[in-house]
Amino acid sequence: MLNMLKDFKIIFRTIMEEITDTQEFTKDMTFEEFKEDRKTQKAVIRGLEIIGEAMNQIPKDFQKKYYKVDWSKWIKFRNMLIHVYHAVDLELVWNAIQEELPTLYSRMLWLVENPFIPKPSDYKK
């Protein structure tokens, strides 16, 4: 994947799109409503999985350099959602949506708008 990727900003934009969708899906919802809405849960969880998987495509050296994004937290969160699918803690998911995604969005936006972000060809995975 990394060899085919010409620009990390494609990944960052994908993450931003998933955040926007997740926020739109849960807009005006309470946690109680979210707990009862399996369709929204599934859509949101899938979006969070995509965010973690996209972040996992970013080389570790890049992650270390741009440490204000908690790459490993989101990758671990994705792994938990994928592998503990039978017992996902919806409160944890809800808190991520409400408290973590806005900050992540602003950090992804900064990376997208930064003209000095290196290209994938500058890194080995």
Language-model segments: what does each one mean?
Residues 1-125:
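Solvent-exposed interaction patches of small proteins and small membrane subunits
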